[in-house]
């Protein structure tokens, strides 16, 4: 794992892969922002970087990632079902189940993946990194 207070930006694929495994996209720390499956901390437990970064609507990006993953999964299921000759009723039951359950299960992952995309688009400022270091020094991730 990288040093928690690193200032160089990881590559986008690395940040996305870290996000898929609920790790901090910046430092790779386990658990990142989560104290439970859905309960979030204000900062990464390892590097201290804040997930909010003074922007309104950050949650919208995570929700959008969830929509893309859910729709992609449903479309893949439907294509597979049509090619395999699955009857219409089972096809729709599974697709409906995926539409309801998939976003709920994947929310923490889509959240950390979106955080990685956001970090790639808008690199943390020196002020963000200084606040992260101060939060770690104060013992309040």
Predicted regions and their residues:
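Short, Lys/Arg-rich, polar N-terminal cytosolic tail immediately upstream
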Residues: 1-10
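Short, flexible, mixed-charge glycine/proline-rich loop motifs
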Residues: 11-21, 33-39
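Short cysteine-rich clusters marking metal-coordination/redox-active sites
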Residues: 24-28, 44-47
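Cys/His-rich microdomains that often coordinate metals
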Residues: 31, 51
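Short amphipathic alpha-helical coupling elements at transmembrane boundaries
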Residues: 42-49, 115, 119
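Select subsegments of transmembrane alpha-helices in polytopic membrane proteins
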Residues: 58-71
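Juxtamembrane "helix exit" motif at the C-terminal ends of alpha-helical transmembrane segments
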Residues: 69-92
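Cytosol/matrix-facing juxtamembrane amphipathic
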Residues: 91-141
């Amino acid at each position: 794992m990288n040093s928690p207070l690193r200032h160089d930006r990881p590559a986008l694929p690395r940040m996305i892969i870290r996000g898929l495994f609920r790790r901090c996209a910046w430092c790779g720390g386990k658990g990142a922002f989560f104290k439970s499956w859905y309960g979030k901390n204000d900062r990464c437990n390892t590097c201290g970087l804040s997930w909010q970064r003074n922007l309104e609507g950050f949650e919208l990006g995570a929700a959008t990632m969830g929509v893309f993953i859910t729709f992609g999964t449903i479309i893949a299921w439907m294509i597979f079902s049509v090619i395999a000759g699955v009857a219409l009723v089972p096809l729709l039951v599974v697709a409906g189940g995926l539409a309801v359950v998939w976003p709920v299960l994947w929310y923490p992952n889509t959240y950390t993946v979106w955080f990685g995309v956001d970090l790639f688009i808008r690199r943390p400022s020196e002020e963000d990194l200084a606040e992260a270091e101060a939060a770690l020094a104060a013992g309040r991730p």
